[in-house]
Amino acid sequence: MKQVQTKRDWKKLAYDVVEEKMITKEDAIAILEADDTEVLEIMNAAYIIRHHHFGKKVKLNMIINTKSGLCPEDCGYCSQSIISEAPIDKYAWLTQEKIVEGAHEAIRRKAGTYCIVASGRRPTDKEVNHVIGAVKEIRETTDLKICCCLGFLNEDQAGLLAEAGVHRYNHNLNTHANNYDSICSTHTYDDRVDTVQKAKQAGISPCSGAIFGMGETIEERAEIAFELQRIDADSIPCNFLVAVKGTPLEGQKELTPVDCLKVLAMMRFVNPTKEIRISGGREINLRSVQPIGLFAANSIFVGDYLTTAGQEPTADWGMIADLGFEIEECAL
């Protein structure tokens, strides 16, 4: 005789989280394994937590790819890696003027955070100074928050970025420690954690998340959320694999739109006070249920990603307005 699974009271679990009672790994796995018919109840419960901490505000972030391709690392998901055969634009560093122009475009797109991203294993000191020159001008002429994602950092470089006024440093964990060797062989999971810690020690707010759909188990997905809690990432980008043609993960498809919603909800339950961002792969993986994702997440990228296209900013603004939510705009 088939055993009937007892339905969870997701709202009660959410109110427990609001009262600062942490959920267990078993609770997180239960969210991920819940029947698809429960997803709206789960998202409604996640919204209780999201609304308690962030109300109806949605943070917008814009990326500029300041150096594309030419990366010596062999990350299997990445179109910019040395082993990728993806037909992407490849170019060396943009000028400081172009980086500053991008900041003003971010404001036009109603973004509050401007993300300066460069491919590569780690920046040279000269490259860090190049970024710092642009950062200082952006800080003098706008009220944007600035995030940098430049690869591995040493302590001196992290300190210089902090001194220049960089608010946040992004360095994703990408996948579970157990799964890391199957994704990349040119650096380790611990290398990535080390850079997150160096940024934090320098006084920069750490931004770190993962790419879901790269062969990790359900249990590992839950453990990633708790690892991000452990390292105290202030901002958590949830990326969903875009299996780019020409990369080793080409054609891999593990996630349904409902799976993605469950990941976002689980991340909100585990990290209730943190900025949860629906990041790369949003349009491709969530498709028509993108708006529902914002009942758990409180942040998105506006415009294009590093090498893949996003939807038009007007579509994102409209989606947010249709939900009755509000853009947390940059103060001009």
Swiss-Prot record:
Q: In which pathway does it act?
A: Cofactor biosynthesis; biotin biosynthesis; biotin from 7,8-diaminononanoate: step 2/2
GO biological process annotations for this chain's record? biotin biosynthetic process
Catalysis performed (reactions): (4R,5S)-dethiobiotin + (sulfur carrier)-SH + 2 reduced [2Fe-2S]-[ferredoxin] + 2 S-adenosyl-L-methionine = (sulfur carrier)-H + biotin + 2 5'-deoxyadenosine + 2 L-methionine + 2 oxidized [2Fe-2S]-[ferredoxin]
Q: Which residues form the Radical SAM core domain?
A: 53-282
Cofactor stoichiometry and binding?
Binds 1 [4Fe-4S] cluster. The cluster is coordinated with 3 cysteines and an exchangeable S-adenosyl-L-methionine.
Cofactors needed by this protein, per the record, are:
[4Fe-4S] cluster; [2Fe-2S] cluster
Listed GO MF terms: 2 iron, 2 sulfur cluster binding; 4 iron, 4 sulfur cluster binding; biotin synthase activity; iron ion binding
Binding positions ([2Fe-2S] cluster): 115, 147, 207, 277
KW 4Fe-4S (keyword) present: yes
Top EC class of this enzyme:
transferase
Give the record's keywords alphabetically. 2Fe-2S, 4Fe-4S, Biotin biosynthesis, Iron, Iron-sulfur, Metal-binding, S-adenosyl-L-methionine, Transferase
Quote the subunit structure annotation.
Homodimer.
State the function annotated in the UniProt record. Catalyzes the conversion of dethiobiotin (DTB) to biotin by the insertion of a sulfur atom into dethiobiotin via a radical-based mechanism.
Q: What is this protein called?
A: Biotin synthase
Gene this protein is translated from: bioB
